[in-house]
Amino acid sequence: MATQASVEWIFNIAGSAASASIAKAIKDAGGSEDFAKYVIARFYDNYKDSVDDTGVYNACIGRARTVDKALDDSRKAERNEDWHTNLETISRLDLELAELKLILSNLGIKREDRVLNSMFSVVREEGKSSNTVMLKQNAVRMIEEGKLKIRVERNENYTASLKNKIEELECMIDAFEKGKEIIISLDAMNGEVKRDGNSCSYNSTAAFVSTIVGNPIKMYDESGKPLFDVGDYLNPKHIIDKMIENEIPIFKSDYRNNESPDFDVWNERSNLKIVSINDCHAICVFKFENAWWCFDDGVLNKYSGNGNPLIVANAKFQIDKILISGDVELNPGPDPLIRLNDCKTKYGIDIICRFYIVLDNDGSIIHMCYMRTGSAEAVAKGRSKKEAKRIAAKDILDQIGL
């Protein structure tokens, strides 16, 4: 402990010597004794904060402990000697780094600022007021090593759309930390729709943005005027820009338009798009259950494949539900699926199960389930895959007498 005590003594003596020198300089300059005491008190506070904030004090104490351990055990002494020999060439740099940290701390640049600056950079687009925060390589390395955790601050006053975007961001961060591919599941939905034959740009943009932000977007005020009015420039690209100006939480990383240099690459992988039909009509199309569907002025239809994409969403977005399909089941009652699975396990029966999708008369989705085991087979319809499968399972159980 002798070396450690000596280091602590050196820090104390250094502080005392510096304070005495400051007091003498103040008096020599004609300053009062009270003023000198005030400055010295402030100096001591700053001195302690600086040596603690920079890590210099802890680093010196740590080395002193190493020396004390080496003095207690000769084997540790040899190892310690090798360590200092191998690092002799960088010892001067280590000292200079400590001095720079002290200078930065005294300039008001604290540890939090240094850490943030070492891991993140801020990029500002020319002509834009918004900023983009970029991860530096140091931050990426720390995430890979599990040493850096990123969390998003929550606030109950946030809108539903913003809360959905925060949850999406947390999913992306979690996937990034675990080295997984980023996938965001979305519900396809319409925003506010006006069926007047002239509002297809607003309708398609409303569906596109509502689906991404996870909340139906209100498009018109009480008088029927568009909230995101773009005048004569009626194009989904301009409407999205207007939405961003009005702080709708959709970001440049969420989509690309056909003027972007990487548009073709995004278009190949995207599952959600705004498509122009004959340069006079716009619809929102999306991929669901390996088939393409569209919202055409709010009406759900199978997509024919005609048209040219104007705007495409990031490939991380995947549609796993259509909001108007009635996919949420309430009080389904006893579950034949569990009974059928028990029979499969108990008797070793093989079950074939396939699903199909058709449109009902009102434009909503109907799921069809074909199920067969042995000579028993059933076809059932439902508002969801699970509902259709449950009905088919009940039919199969009745046929095989269970």
Curated annotation (Swiss-Prot):
Site note Cleavage, residues: G333, P334
Coiled coil: none
Compartments (UniProt record): Host cytoplasm
Keywords per UniProt: Host cytoplasm, RNA-binding, Translation regulation
GO BP field: regulation of translation
GO molecular function, one term: RNA binding
Cytoplasm recorded as keyword: no
Gene Ontology CC: host cell cytoplasm
Classification via InterPro entries: dsRBD_dom, NSP3_N_rotavirus, NSP3_sf, Rotavirus_NSP3
Domain DRBM: 334-402
Family: Belongs to the rotavirus NSP3 family.
Cited function: May play a role in stimulating the translation of viral mRNAs.
Protein name: Non-structural protein 3
